[in-house]
UniProtKB/Swiss-Prot annotation:
SUPFAM superfamilies: PRTase-like
UniProt protein name: Xanthine-guanine phosphoribosyltransferase
Taxonomic source organism: Idiomarina loihiensis (strain ATCC BAA-735 / DSM 15497 / L2-TR)
Residues binding guanine: D99, I142
Reaction(s) this enzyme catalyzes, per UniProt: GMP + diphosphate = guanine + 5-phospho-alpha-D-ribose 1-diphosphate; XMP + diphosphate = xanthine + 5-phospho-alpha-D-ribose 1-diphosphate; IMP + diphosphate = hypoxanthine + 5-phospho-alpha-D-ribose 1-diphosphate
Xref: InterPro entries: PRibTrfase_dom (IPR000836), PRTase-like (IPR029057), Xanthine_Guanine_PRibTrfase (IPR023747)
Family: Belongs to the purine/pyrimidine phosphoribosyltransferase family. XGPT subfamily.
Lineage, broadest ranks: Bacteria, Pseudomonadati, Pseudomonadota, Gammaproteobacteria, Alteromonadales
Length: 161
C-alpha cells in the first residue's frame, strides 16, 4: 500500500544550505567531534555542508534504507555499515530528515554514544534526534533539491484563455 501525502514541501538548494549551516552552527564547538557519519543517501549533502562548516575532515557513511522511492517500508536494509567507530562516541550522525524515526532508532541502537541531528523533522521521529532546524507536519512529503529537475516555465502573460 502506497503512502499518500496531503501536503508537499519543496526545498531549494539555497534553503537547504542555509538550514544546514544553521544546524552546523548549533553543533559548535567542533572540537567535541572525532568525525561525522552521513546517513546515505539523504544525509550526504547535509553532512558535506556540516563537515565544511565545522572543519571536520573525517566523514564516514552508513547506508540504511527504509524507503522504496515513494513508499516507506517497515523493514530496514543496511547496505553499508559504519567503519570509523564501534559505538559512535565523538561522532555526529547527520541526515536530511527524520520521518517515522525508524532509521534513527535503528542507528541509535548501533551507535548509542553518537549525537544525532537532521535538517528537518516530523513529529513521529523528533524524539529520535538530538537537534533539528525545522519541523514539518507528519503528512508532508518533502521534495529535496536533488530529487527535482529544473525546467523552463512559460510566463503567465500570453497564457490567458
Amino acid at each position: 500500500m502506497g503512502w499518500h501525502s496531503n501536503r508537499e514541501f519543496f526545498v531549494s538548494w539555497e534553503e537547504l544550505h542555509r538550514a544546514t549551516r544553521e544546524l552546523a552552527r548549533r553543533q559548535l564547538p567542533a572540537e567535541q567531534y572525532k568525525g561525522i557519519i552521513a546517513v546515505s543517501r539523504g544525509g550526504l549533502v547535509p553532512a558535506a555542508i556540516v563537515s565544511r562548516e565545522l572543519n571536520i575532515r573525517v566523514v564516514d557513511c552508513v547506508a540504511v534504507s527504509s524507503y522504496d522511492h515513494t513508499e516507506q517500508r517497515d523493514d530496514l536494509q543496511v547496505m553499508k555499515d559504519v567503519t570509523a567507530t564501534e559505538d559512535g562516541e565523538g561522532f555526529l550522525v547527520v541526515d536530511d530528515l527524520v520521518d517515522t524515526g525508524n532509521t534513527m532508532k535503528f542507528l541509535r541502537e548501533r551507535l548509542p554514544k553518537a549525537k544525532f541531528v537532521t535538517v528537518y523533522a516530523k513529529p513521529s521521529g523528533m524524539e529520535m534526534v538530538d537537534d533539528f532546524v525545522a519541523d514539518l507536519a507528519q503528512d508532508t512529503w518533502i521534495h529535496f533539491p536533488w530529487d527535482m529537475h529544473l525546467h523552463y516555465i512559460e510566463p503567465l502573460a500570453g497564457q490567458e484563455s
